[in-house]
């Protein structure tokens, strides 16, 4: 918002509605979506996408190429590191009949003076009331799955990107979360705040295994300049019990059932004395060696930056 206009920004990870736990009606798309809509006046905006692969250790190449996954002719940005490829696509729309769709031009941006190991992408926008642009960052399908927008059959992992699809993904995601929070049995005071907290707790759960992370943060210091900045993206048995107790009290039991499945799996690989570890990776791994990333500054200069070395190589990025 500024003196000339107001824009509404919506970030979401698409989620299809589901009727029961782990019973998806549609495949999940590994997309990070940002929708920008100007709701009043005119507002200048700058979009920058600058991924840093493997915690800014790996270099990458960036190119702007034709996008075969959309109906009309336009460009997309590709970011390629040794282990991972991402692409950034967009789709435009308008909510007013008298308003035309915005034009988008992607350009390369050199951020090497800030320590980036590959070019970023930038787009300067001047949106007016009713204009909408949605950006989609994703891991593109493998070459064997690629098809152009006119292909008769396409992989479910690579649907044609249209404004109708984006609208459907947003409404489906809203439905999923609304359906989930409706399961709450809480009737006490500050209901809205309690439900907002429940949503935050739900986001700590890694659904493929049922694991619950202590916090979705790493190297966030307890105080500015301090060294107690650990990686909390792992499952502590004790901490998880507190999270699940809160959810159970609110009526959410599926998450507790899933965590018990996670525990039962861990019981198949107990310590020699028959005990469990105090913590595991979200995949159930027992090796949680922590490493320091000395090339990163940390939050407001708080060092060292720490992370666990057990995360999937290539999928750790900084935006």
How would you label these PLM feature ranges?
Residues 1-319:
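Acidic, mature catalytic/reactive cores of soluble proteins
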């Amino acid at each position: 918002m500024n003196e000339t206009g107001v824009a509404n920004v919506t970030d979401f990870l698409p989620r299809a509605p589901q009727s029961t736990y782990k019973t998806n009606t549609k495949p999940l798309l590994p997309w990070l979506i940002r929708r920008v809509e100007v709701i009043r006046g005119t507002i200048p905006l700058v979009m920058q996408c600058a991924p840093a692969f493997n915690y800014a250790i790996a270099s990458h190449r960036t190119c702007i190429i034709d996008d075969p996954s959309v109906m009309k002719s336009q460009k997309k940005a590709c970011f390629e590191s040794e282990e991972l490829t991402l692409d950034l696509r967009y789709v435009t729309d308008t909510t007013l009949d008298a308003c035309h769709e915005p034009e988008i031009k992607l350009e390369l941006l050199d951020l090497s003076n800030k320590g980036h190991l590959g070019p970023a992408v930038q787009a300067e926008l001047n949106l007016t009331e009713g204009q909408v642009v949605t950006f989609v960052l994703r891991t593109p399908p493998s070459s064997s799955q690629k098809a152009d927008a006119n292909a008769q059959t396409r992989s479910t992992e690579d649907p044609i990107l249209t404004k109708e699809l984006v609208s459907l993904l947003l409404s489906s995601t809203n439905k999923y979360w609304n359906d989930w929070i409706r399961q709450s049995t809480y009737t006490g005071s500050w209901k809205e705040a309690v439900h907002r907290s429940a949503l935050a707790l739900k986001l700590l759960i890694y659904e493929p295994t049922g694991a619950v992370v202590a916090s979705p943060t790493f190297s966030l210091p307890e105080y500015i300049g301090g060294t107690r900045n650990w990686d909390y993206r792992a499952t502590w048995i004790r901490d998880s019990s507190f999270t699940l107790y809160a959810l159970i009290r609110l009526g959410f039991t599926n998450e507790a059932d899933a965590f018990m499945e996670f525990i039962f799996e861990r019981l198949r690989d107990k310590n020699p004395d028959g005990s469990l570890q105090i913590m595991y990776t979200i995949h159930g791994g027992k090796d949680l060696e922590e490493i320091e990333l000395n090339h990163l500054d940390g939050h407001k200069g708080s060092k060292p930056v720490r992370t666990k070395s057990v995360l999937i190589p290539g999928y750790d990025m900084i935006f």
